[in-house]
A protein has these predicted regions:
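Acidic/polar loop patches that form or flank catalytic/metal-binding clefts of enzymes
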Residues: 98-108, 184-186, 301-305
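Generic structural motif
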Residues: 12-14, 70-72, 103, 110-114, ...
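Amphipathic alpha-helical coiled-coil/helical-bundle segments that mediate oligomerization/assembly
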Residues: 131, 137, 150, 155-157, ...
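Short, conserved charged micro-motifs
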Residues: 159-166
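Structural preference for long, well-ordered alpha-helical segments in enzyme cores
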Residues: 168-176, 290, 294
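A broad structural signal for short, well-ordered beta-strand segments within beta-sheet-rich domains
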Residues: 4, 93-95, 176-190
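GHKL (Bergerat-fold) ATPase N-terminal catalytic module, capturing the glycine-rich phosphate-binding loop
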Residues: 1-153
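A generic secondary-structure signal for well-formed alpha-helical elements
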Residues: 28, 32, 93-100, 176, ...
Length: 469
């Protein structure tokens, strides 16, 4: 909220500690339990509304306000441990006060400049160049009622406070998804709430519902892996709303563009400016959890999460895409007619498969992809993960040794007939087995005689069994 030229950001949870103050004045990662190596404070740069809000909460850990999906009972969720970067506050303010129930401190650029002038070390510095977060003074003011810590920024003239709040409101839903310790954000009376619950069927997957801001609600599936969480928004039917383009988040956005269809929030080590992945970061486990995200979707929607090859925006995007493709290629997630969820490399797809044809072929064509996923639309992405395509000729070949009663063959022909439009399809089915009157199979209908009187059986006539005619 805003009062005059003061921007207030308050939270609940663990209060400010002496170690935290020392870390803030040293401009390094804050000494907080569970802190991830490689997370560092950001430097002065162009800061967005999201950075200001997240950086202010970095001054104190947030306690467990709501049970998060996949949470650890022994380690409470935290915001500050991520080192979002408290130095972002210095880009819009010359005075920053941290009011906490354990004690309060004040950073003041003018007072710092006065101290520098007093000891005669100002040199070529100007008052504007003096670092804000180096010297700290004690403050006697406590946080607002109902909060454990409050950050008060006296915003410089010329900065549009209303515009800053509008930006924060726009970014609040994403911030709730990225910082899992948060359950609610209120920005000048505009309230956002997130509700998390575990998925009823898939372990390590949950749903997150974000409400508020006058925009209704948005639902997300969230899968947790070793070094990343994977998210995809879903519509009212549960189908994925695939991301067109996004950036890697750790947990808030970096500058690394991603072309993946799902959002990635990683714990990978970053460079000091928190904009790039550290050169020594281990990407081997980043795809862990992606398969669980796919399994949480309805079978017909799962191929939507297969990454498109050749669209990588940068080397990190290419590496993560390759890891995800390897996970998807080797995993058991593709719904098949007879075998449940199967491995793509052992599956075959017949484009425009119908339910009657699937019922007839399911136990004869191993790994036949189910009807819901047999649209030609999915064929290019399914090929990328090892799925083979089968046509009418392939079906005929695979039925060469089938031992089925004549009535079964009649049902098969009936299921195939809507797919035969002309001589091309007839030629493709030229070797389709036909049961004969003598109990044997004929490969194709050529050479078979059909009696003039329907239902007639004559052993001396080489014709199709009457039950299939």
């Amino acid at each position: 909220w805003v009062t005059g030229r003061e921007l207030h950001v308050a939270n609940t949870g663990a209060p400010l500690s002496a170690a935290g103050v020392r870390s803030l004045t040293a401009l390094r990662v804050s000494a907080k339990a569970g802190h991830r190596p490689g997370a560092r404070d950001i430097g002065a740069r162009d800061i967005g509304a999201r950075d200001i809000g997240a950086a202010a909460t970095d001054a104190a850990d947030i306690g467990p306000v709501e049970a998060g999906v996949g949470g650890d009972d022994e380690t409470p969720p935290a915001v500050g441990r991520f080192g979002v970067g408290f130095t972002a506050t210095a880009t819009i303010a010359d005075t920053v006060e941290i009011r906490s129930r354990s004690g309060s401190v004040l950073f003041d650029r003018a007072r710092t400049w006065a101290e520098i002038e007093t000891i005669g070390v100002a040199g070529a510095l100007t008052a504007r160049q003096v670092p804000l977060l180096r010297l700290v003074w004690e403050s006697s003011r406590g946080p607002a009622d109902g909060f454990d810590t409050e950050i008060v920024l006296t915003v410089r003239a010329g900065i549009d406070l209303d515009g800053l709040l509008v930006g924060m409101i726009a970014e609040a839903p994403d911030l709730l998804l990225e910082l899992t310790a948060l359950s609610e954000i209120d920005i000048a009376g505009t309230r956002f709430v997130i509700h998390r619950r575990p998925h009823p069927e898939v372990p390590d997957v949950g749903t997150a519902i974000v409400r508020g801001g006058g925009a209704g609600e948005r639902a997300w599936l969230v899968a947790h892996g070793r070094s990343a969480s994977w998210l995809v928004e879903t519509d009212a039917t549960g189908a994925p709303v695939v991301a067109g383009s996004d950036v890697l988040r750790a947990p808030t956005p970096t500058d690394i563009e991603l072309s993946l269809p799902a959002r990635c929030i990683t714990t990978l080590a970053l460079t000091p400016d928190r904009r790039r992945v550290h050169p020594d970061a281990d990407l081997s486990g980043v795809a862990d959890g992606y398969l669980s995200l796919m399994l949480a979707l309805a079978p017909a929607s799962r191929p939507a999460l297969i990454p498109r090859i050749g669209l990588a925006r940068n080397d990190i995007d290419a590496a993560i895409t390759a890891a995800v493709l390897a996970e998807v290629t080797d995993g058991r997630w593709l719904p098949t007619v007879a075998d449940g969820d199967g491995v793509p490399g052992r599956a075959v797809l017949f484009a425009d498969l119908t339910a009657p044809l699937a019922d007839a072929l399911g136990d004869l064509v191993g790994g036949l992809v189910c009807v819901e996923v047999s649209s030609p639309t999915w064929l290019p992405v399914l090929r990328a993960v090892g799925v083979d395509e089968i046509g009418l000729a392939g079906i005929a070949d695979r039925l060469a040794g089938a031992d089925r009663p004549p009535r079964w063959w009649w049902k098969l022909y009936d299921a195939l007939s809507p797919l035969v439009f002309g001589p091309i399809e007839v030629e493709a089915l030229g070797a389709l087995p036909v049961p004969r009157t003598d109990g044997r199979l004929n490969f194709g209908a050529r050479g078979l005689l059909i009696p003039r009187i329907p239902g007639t059986r004559a052993c001396w006539i080489t014709g199709p069994d009457p039950e299939v005619v």
